[in-house]
A protein has these predicted regions:
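Alpha/beta catalytic cores of group-transfer enzymes, especially the acyltransferase/condensing modules
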Residues: 19-168
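Conserved small-residue
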Residues: 11, 52, 84, 116, ...
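Gly/Ser/Thr-rich beta-alpha loop segments that engage phosphate groups in nucleotides
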Residues: 9, 13, 50, 88, ...
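Glycine-rich nucleophile elbow surrounding the catalytic serine of serine-hydrolase chemistry
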Residues: 8-17, 21-22
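Conserved residues at the C-terminal ends of beta-strands
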Residues: 8, 109, 190
Length: 203
């Protein structure tokens, strides 16, 4: 029997289905709407994301604040990998600043918008309306939230976190550290690859 569920970004919906908090039909409705809103909320190709390799989120946050950069951390994937979001022009202008501060690699990602950033605020508000229509169920197996990396089986807390996920940071590093508190001895990744297993190995 599983001890806890968690998923990365879109994968959190899969985790909610696996944990029986939501049925697969309702999850599919939310996922479809989420995708539509994320791609229609901002003009295509004016915003994006970039992966920064070699520094942790605390360090990247410091560089952003010190240099008044107009980008935000979207994904705290591991102590050595952080993804930022923002307008394309702001991502480009930040690249050399990050290199000057010791970043090893800066990789612009092939995405259409600045996901998990404040540029998704309007889309998030619309998605909340859809989430409010869904019938969620309580479950005795907890889930670790992307939004605040807390362990929850309380359905109100889970819904609150889900409502705030789209426009905020995915706290994957903190989530895995929280997982360690459950004394979990085996992690099973379910998905098309082994990306998360690779990230977990670095945490």
């Amino acid at each position: 029997k599983p001890k806890v569920f968690l998923g990365h970004s879109l994968g959190e919906y899969s985790a909610l289905v696996a944990g029986n908090f939501i049925n697969i039909t309702d999850a599919s409705i939310l996922i479809k709407k989420r995708g539509e809103l994320m791609h229609s909320s901002i003009e295509p190709n004016i915003s994006g994301m970039a992966a920064i390799i070699g520094k942790n989120a605390k360090f990247i946050d410091g560089v952003i604040k010190k240099n008044n950069l107009k980008v935000v951390i979207a994904n705290d994937n591991s102590p050595m990998q952080v993804v930022i979001s923002g307008l394309i022009e702001d991502i480009i202008s930040s690249e050399q600043i990050f290199f000057k501060n010791g970043v090893k690699r800066f990789v612009k990602l092939n995405v259409s918008a600045a996901f998990h950033s404040n540029l998704m605020n309007d889309a998030q508000l619309e998605l909340i309306n859809e989430i409010n229509k869904i019938n969620f169920k309580n479950c005795n197996i907890p889930i670790i939230s992307n939004y605040d990396s807390t362990i929850n089986s309380n359905i109100e807390s889970i819904i609150y976190s889900l409502k705030n996920q789209m426009a905020n940071r995915v706290r994957w590093t903190d989530s895995i550290k929280k997982l360690e508190e459950t004394e979990t001895t085996q992690i099973i990744e379910i998905g098309p690859g082994k990306v998360l297993s690779g990230l977990i190995a670095r945490i």
